[in-house]
Amino acid sequence: MEGNAPSRGHPLEGYTTLKQFKGAKSNAIYELDGRPPFLQAFPLGFQQLLAMFVGNIVPMILVAGEARLDSYYSTLLIQCSVLGAGVATLLQAFPIRLGRIRIGSGLPIMMGLTYTFLPICLAVATNEALGLPVLFGAQLVAALSSVLVAFVLPYIRKFFPPIVTGTIIVSIGISCFSIAAYNLAGGQGDPTMGQLHNWLIGGLVIVVIVACSAFGKGMVSAAAVLIGIVAGYVVAAVGGYVDFSNIASAKWFDIPRPLAFGDGGPALVFKPEFILVFILLYFINAVEMVGDMTVSATGGLGRQPKDEELSGGILGNAFACMFASVFNCFATGSYSQCSGIVAMTKVCSRWVMGTGALTLIAAAFCPKLAGL
């Protein structure tokens, strides 16, 4: 609106008072193209990171365990999962333009390893006659199908009216309940799974999040999830429920090695039957992404996502999955819980997501940081 937005001249140009300018700066986290100060953007991006980090590395932990990989390759898989998620998120936050083609949605969505592919990943990786090279090869070639979906999506969007996308969103929300309850009880690999202290600490996190969201103002409300997680982490650490040994033994710097699997043979193996399976899974993943992008747009921005944003999001993920295949990472997809945070807090700045993505990438090169 006239008088509310600055021009490209002096920073104060377009604002009546310094107070009005500062107020606009403070509201930058609630604008898609808002550029909040780093000290404001970082904790909000870190909040998104915390909401997806465990879910992002669990598929790699499961596959590494089932495939009986040694500690080096297990750590490498986790590193690559963090790198893949960071690159995919960064591409969504800051799309690349190639003429009229847009690679990335430009919407506030957080990317990570998708569980849609987990059953086939476990089956292929644990089969001695197949292994990870077959998995990454099929994943790489099948990602081309997402390119096709991205280009035809504007023409088939009429088959996804609000009633359909609304149903998808509800289904995504319901599916998160079982995952949330499982993690609340202790999560994967916790020997104290289901014990009372897990429920009490989890309950504390929920209470803090709800209280900050309902009664907090400004950053307290916007960072409600981060505050809740930190509160739970501190209580767990004081109670002796946090193991810091993995942090002490982790390296400060390590470069994720591409095409690391193959045992002297090809690191990528292409089998048509598995490529076809992955093509189907990529379509399912695209539908889920449409739902998550709709949640972020409607909940955070108060509007429906544009055709360009949806197709750009699918296309961006296609290229992210190709990158992931080369860097020993499983296919990526949008994380519903992170879109839910956008809808709850209204923090929809792409720069906030960008700081979260850059933190993920930094963690991929610093195992000690990832161990936190």
Map each language-model feature to its residues.
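Membrane-helix interface "capping/anchor" motifs
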Residues: F94-L107, P154-F159, S213-A224, T345-R350
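Alpha-helical transmembrane segments of multi-pass membrane proteins, especially transporters
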Residues: L44-Q48, Y73-A85, G104-Y115, P119, ...
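Helix-boundary and loop/linker segments of multi-pass membrane transporters
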Residues: Y30-P37, G262-E273, K306-D307
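Membrane-embedded alpha-helical modules
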Residues: V124-D243, T355-L372
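Membrane-embedded helical hairpins/re-entrant loop segments and their flanking transmembrane helices
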Residues: F38, A64-L83, V87-G104, V277-R350
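Generic transmembrane alpha-helix signature in multi-pass membrane proteins
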Residues: M60-E66, L118-T126, P154, N183-A185, ...
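N-terminal signal-anchor module of multipass membrane proteins
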Residues: E2-I109, T116-V124
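Flexible hinge motifs at transmembrane-helix junctions and intramembrane kinks/re-entrant loops
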Residues: E2-Y15, E66, S71-I78, M193, ...
